[in-house]
Amino acid sequence: NLGNPLPLIREQLLKIYKEHPGLQVASVTTTGYGEDLVKNAFRCDYGLVETVAHFTAAKYFMPDVDFIIDIGGQDMKCFKIEDGAISNIFLNEACSSGCGSFLQTFAQALGYDVKQFAALGLFADRPVDLGSRCTVFMNSSVKQAQKDGASIENISAGLSISVVKNALYKVIRASSPEELGRKIVVQGGTFYNEAVLRAFEKEMGVEVIRPDIAGLMGAYGAALFGLRQSQKAHKTASAMMSQKELEKFEQKVVSVKCGGCGNHCQLTVNTFADGRKYISGNRCDKPVTGKSADDSLNLYAYKQQLLAEYKPVAGKRGSIGIPLCLGFYELLPFWWAFWTKLGFAVHTSPVSSRGLYLAGQATIPSDTACFPAKLSHGHIKALSQMQLDAIFYPCLTYNVDEGLGDNHYNCPVVAYYPEVLAGNCPELEGKKFIYDYVGIHRPKDFVHKMAKDVLPKYFGGISEREVQAAADAAYAEYEAHMAKIRVKGSEIIDEARRQGKRIIVLAGRPYHVDPEVNHGIDHLITRHGAAVVTEDSISNRVQKFPTSVLNQWTYHSRLYAAAKYCTTQKDMDLVQLVSFGCGVDAITTDETREILQEGGKLYTQLKIDEITNLGAVNIRLRSLFAALDERDEVAAEKAE
């Protein structure tokens, strides 16, 4: 559809009307990536997230299905089914390697069309072992296989096996085929490929059902959903445009930048012939309703408000700059109180923005760092342009000990990124940049270190007694700050329950509160009608418990504790935010998933970086809410 599905769909709808004069359409449901646009453009009745559409279709063909796998051209969806409801959803993340386009690309590179290439794979006598790595590595593996004299048949079969192994062991991360189930429906256009189908059956050790409309299962599921909804509502006629209206249909598209808030979203405004408009690209409802988002049940917004209250207080000793990034999203109250008590005016860098990120981009030494770390370069750049006596960003190996883990480290990036900044930011030359190694986990040692080692290097005339008083103020401010978060979290939970709303623990690190890092995902959740709390607002409700991994980081100990607590609350679910490039999260995601699944909860992971398109994020969130609704419906039916 070349990025615009409307002309194509209009053409097909007119064709249907012309071939079936007098046809009465009972209901129309849209699904897929263009769902909202198509629904609004043609006044369709319902919209359905594609994951649920595929699930609905699969259940029609096999009512007792326990596993569904859908491999399309660019994405992959897998569902584990228990007691007739979705118990787990797996979606591929940023990379589309191992999907249909992956096979098509290789077929074309080898001089075949994809159907011919697939057919050859069925006659392989010795499929090449190409592993299940990404396309870049696979390219070199295929070339090596050709050099070794492998036939096209064996290469085709090897690639089909790779697609299957990628799905099973990289996306789903199954330890064995048996754990997935025995009653399996496969769908998606990729399964029209007979070699992929056969490879899947051989790997799983069972025969599976592939409907002859495998590539249209989403559309079929949407139709079944529409049928059910119209029957429930006793509707016999759809609200969709008539033939005459379709013939007059026009669409004008304009791209504008929203000035409603600091997000400056790039909006796409579709205007239709009858004057209606459809706006996309917005992270909140303000461009549509003219009203700001309701943040009364959003703890992320509350935490942002708390941090905004820390303004500079004029002091006798000068000014200190603190970058509002990484660990300072939690420790700003501590360091603000410490330096203010010592007589310094504490200035923070501006709130993160796209412009601030781009301003510091030239000094980022490695693209493998997580986005929050990359942002810190922009914060340092901003501070360097302010008239400050010093910039303060200490190295902190340890975090506070909350008694939840085996140790209480900061991750290497949070702990030591000041070293990277000192070595790569030329704007710090000639500036007083304080990035000494400090530990706040031992109050007595902290006072001694600051009074005897750190402060004398940069400032004179500060006594140990003053440092002790400043430290006391800092610890008290930090405790008060964390207490406010826990109290507000409790208030939000109580109010959400009073209103009958779902509660989502949007769990990550303190710096995921940064709007430029989370891209407004908290608002996306509240727009779905749920309340948002954070992992640090509920982690104190759980005692230390055994984990499958070494539990040695403060932030991650909270994450595990929050996941554990969620399993005890019927109306609470956890969504984990993960920054691309985070090595530690390779461990935490599996552990968090395990904790939630053992407690009968769904696990949802959202990977985020500098890319602001939330289309895939919205699909995951809608899939979560739809799966939870499905569970409730199944439970209610059983209770009856």
Regions found by a protein language model. Name each.
Residues S140-Y169:
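Adenine-nucleotide phosphate-binding core of ATP-dependent small-molecule kinases
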